[in-house]
């Protein structure tokens, strides 16, 4: 008997994990072949530009706490406003995807407005205005990420492109975490926002080189609707919940990783070097996801990676031992880069226009927003980092509920 989850999933563009082609990739329209590796890289930049601040969250948080004298709670509120804005933007664009045929124009407008908000943040240099400014910036960035995820979902190269998103983010995160702290110490609190402007500008220059990846035509939508087998929403809901919990747990620790390290008497230079190199090594996780996505089904690699992540998070309890702190950062970095493409690919298989892929982006942003906020309140309220590590590990354990859903998609 045919599995309904599998039937509906295969109506979405091939993610790279299923081993089959459900829709042909979009025809070449831009200056690039629409299903090539360069296309995946440029799509990854498009989907990362509105999210790059997440990869340098530790630098931003530490700059606000050490440079501007804010508490963990205040820094958490500012980062929450940025990421909560992204949640609002991603959620809004998820409902509008089918009504944005000229997505390149929309992306260009969002990028220009995001650059403008970063310029305002630097020029005004007013901590009281940071929350509203970063909220608006987050809304623009979230809409851009949701738009990018939707385009990837209908590109025909979703699995590879989602892996490239993590690859781009971790490379950018490496350079940010490696070099920005020293620049912040030399030039001031607002240096990270110059990095955001640079990333957005590069993406804006790449935009004309990306193929069009149009929405399905009315006839294609009609044929798909006639052939579609109704899909129970439970697997999709579980996927979104798992993606939320995964991002929540990881970001709750990552956003405060500098302060966490200092609480275990680790020197700032050691923490910065460890986190930056761990971010670079974590690129291997995204590369591995791209490889296994072409060769293996979803469930088994995802289950193994989630178990390894649980172990990696618990290793942070022993951060006073330097090799263990290094190992914890490397392990969780690699599994973070590995698991997110799998969750996003699962979400993208539920429709052909990319709307469900955009909802996956919404769940991801919600987790990224709530993690630092809850962690900030927890630490300011008197909780220890050891307790926070245990809480984050418990939240991440919920993600194991997505393994049966992945197995169902594999059948």
Stretch-by-stretch model annotation:
Residues 57-58, 235-276:
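Extracytoplasmic gate region of multi-pass secondary transporters
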Residues 155, 164-215:
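Helix-loop-helix hairpin linking two adjacent transmembrane segments in secondary transporters
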Residues 89-102, 285-298, 379-380:
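Helix-to-loop junctions at the C-terminal end of transmembrane segments
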Residues 128-137, 323-331:
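Paired small-residue
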Residues 350-384, 392:
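A late C-terminal transmembrane helix in Major Facilitator Superfamily
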Residues 297-343:
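C-terminal transmembrane helical hairpin of 12-TM major facilitator-type secondary transporters
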Residues 143-156, 337-351:
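Intracellular juxtamembrane helix-capping segments at the cytosolic ends
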Residues 135-168:
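Cytoplasmic helix-loop-helix junction between adjacent transmembrane helices
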């Amino acid at each position: 008997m045919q599995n309904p989850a599998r039937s509906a999933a295969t109506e979405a563009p091939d993610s790279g994990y299923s081993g089959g082609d459900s829709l042909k990739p979009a025809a070449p329209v831009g200056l690039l072949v629409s299903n090539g590796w360069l296309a995946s890289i440029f799509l990854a930049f498009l989907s990362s530009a509105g999210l790059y601040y997440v990869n340098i969250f530790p630098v931003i948080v530490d700059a606000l706490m050490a440079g501007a004298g804010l508490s963990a709670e205040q820094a958490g509120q500012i980062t929450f406003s940025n990421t909560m804005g992204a949640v609002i933007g991603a959620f809004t664009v998820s409902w509008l995807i089918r009504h944005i045929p000229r997505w390149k124009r929309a992306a260009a407008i969002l990028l220009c407005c995001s650059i403008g908000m970063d310029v305002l943040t630097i020029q005004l240099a007013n901590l009281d205005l940071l929350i509203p400014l970063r909220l608006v910036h987050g809304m623009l960035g979230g809409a851009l990420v949701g738009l990018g995820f939707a385009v990837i979902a209908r590109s025909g190269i979703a699995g590879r492109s989602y892996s490239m998103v993590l690859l781009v983010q971790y490379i950018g995160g490496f350079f940010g975490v490696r070099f920005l702290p020293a620049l912040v110490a030399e030039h001031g609190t607002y240096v990270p926002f110059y990095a955001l402007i640079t990333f957005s500008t590069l993406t804006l220059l790449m935009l004309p080189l990306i193929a069009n990846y149009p929405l399905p035509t009315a006839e294609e939508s009609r044929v798909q609707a006639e052939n579609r087998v109704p899909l129970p929403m439970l697997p999709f809901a579980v996927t979104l919940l798992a993606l939320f919990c995964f991002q929540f747990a990881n970001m709750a620790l990552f956003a405060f990783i500098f302060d966490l390290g200092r609480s275990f008497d680790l020197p700032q230079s050691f923490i910065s070097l460890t986190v930056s190199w761990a971010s670079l090594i974590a690129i291997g996780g995204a590369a591995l996801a791209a490889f296994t996505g072409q060769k293996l089904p979803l469930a088994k690699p995802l289950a193994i990676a989630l178990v390894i992540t649980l172990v990696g998070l618990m290793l942070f309890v022993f951060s006073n031992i330097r090799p263990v702190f290094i190992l914890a950062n490397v392990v969780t970095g690699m599994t973070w880069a590995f698991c997110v493409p799998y969750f996003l690919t699962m979400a993208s298989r539920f429709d052909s226009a990319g709307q469900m892929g955009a909802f996956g982006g919404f769940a991801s942003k919600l987790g990224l927003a709530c993690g630092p906020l809850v962690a900030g309140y927890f630490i300011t309220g008197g909780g220890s980092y050891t307790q926070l590590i245990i809480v984050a590990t418990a939240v991440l354990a919920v993600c194991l509920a997505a393994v049966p859903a992945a197995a169902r998609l594999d059948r």
